[in-house]
């Protein structure tokens, strides 16, 4: 079974495989889409040991997430007796064969594409303001037989924002998140050749900037979620004789990943758990 990923818009090729190949289970991990590739199963998660299939890119074992979808020609899945007969114990959990694009006989063909994408949260909850939080806290303490935490004067200060430094009303989502995340995907390919030499060359630059608002308080440090990747590939096919063809595959992968000191999960947990009246900005 083969599939083509050129029409998929996910960043990680492993995530792009969802729903494309019969018998392949794709489990996307938590966190941002560029932080974690998917976990792949062919025979299912049936043991305590590794259930990951063997992934071969042009015959060599490597992660599929090191590639860009633009350079992938096709993906095949081998399982059961076929996988074990060809690859032995290494193919016990199935085999995923990835073929990258190659040159063909003909005039040079050059393509260039640019994609700009934006994404926004589908739905964000509306949290209680500082005054509502203070009222709810007073009610909770009274229900427990305790004295109210805030007096009437303090409640008025929350409501009217008379002293915001002492009785704050902070919208943590608005303070921490942008309305949109942005990304660029630039792709350049050239392919062609003669009956003796055929070539395929690709340059792919991917840049994604997340929802967190960047800060400029400290030079050289940014809290923004950012993922940049440059992929360079050249595949050569050289026909030496009618019975001999030499293949040369070159791949370069350069990645820059910037994130805050905490994980994405912890950041959003804090945004959802810290009350608006806890402390000022």
Q: What are the residue ranges of the model-derived segments?
A:
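Outer-membrane beta-barrel and related beta-rich outer-membrane complex signature
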Residues: 121-130, 211-215, 247-278
């Amino acid at each position: 079974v083969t599939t083509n990923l050129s029409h998929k818009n996910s960043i990680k090729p492993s995530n792009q495989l969802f729903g494309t190949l019969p018998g392949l289970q794709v489990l996307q991990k938590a966190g941002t889409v560029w932080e974690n590739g998917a976990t792949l199963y062919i025979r299912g998660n049936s043991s305590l040991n590794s259930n990951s299939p063997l992934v071969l890119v042009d015959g060599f074992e490597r992660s599929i997430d090191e590639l860009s979808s633009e350079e992938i020609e096709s993906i095949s899945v081998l399982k059961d007796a076929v996988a074990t007969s060809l690859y032995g114990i290494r193919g016990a959990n199935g085999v995923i064969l990835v073929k990258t694009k190659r040159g063909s006989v003909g005039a040079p063909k050059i393509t260039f594409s640019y994609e700009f994408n934006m994404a926004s949260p589908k739905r964000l909850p509306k949290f209680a303001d500082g005054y509502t939080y203070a009222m709810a806290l007073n009610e909770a303490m009274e229900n427990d037989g305790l004295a109210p935490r805030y007096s009437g004067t303090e409640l008025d200060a929350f409501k009217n924002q008379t002293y915001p430094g002492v009785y704050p009303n902070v919208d943590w989502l608005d303070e921490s998140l942008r309305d949109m995340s942005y990304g660029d995907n630039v792709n350049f390919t050239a392919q062609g050749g003669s009956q003796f030499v055929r070539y395929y060359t690709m340059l792919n630059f991917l840049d994604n900037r997340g929802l967190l608002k960047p800060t400029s308080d400290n030079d050289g440090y940014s809290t923004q979620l950012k993922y940049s990747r440059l992929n360079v590939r050249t595949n050569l096919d050289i026909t030496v004789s009618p019975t001999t063809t030499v293949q040369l595959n070159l791949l370069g992968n350069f990645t820059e990943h910037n994130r805050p000191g905490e994980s994405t999960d912890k950041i959003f947990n804090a945004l959802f758990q810290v009350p608006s009246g806890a402390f000022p900005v």
